[in-house]
């Protein structure tokens, strides 16, 4: 049986503490970069070869050749945001098809979820 080392980067704030940028710095040292939970709410801006990218769903290891990137079971994907992000990366020459794996159990945010969420927040009022 092969055993390997696994490092996990966790955020213990509200999710906006800069994990994405830290992961981007660390990705050259790892073979697999995986998101295991979270959604597309914050995003992180990265610069790669002089171009700026905003990643909200796709792991930043996508910029490193030969790395496997995984979107895991606990990730919440918004298909419209994900597809926009993927198209922007592919237009810039980044190969997602051979380096990005998405769990069949990843959750989806559908337009109805956003409408319902907005209605619930509106019903709460300002307090």
PLM features: residue spans?
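Non-transmembrane, aqueous-exposed alpha-helical and coiled segments at domain scale
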Residues: 1-127
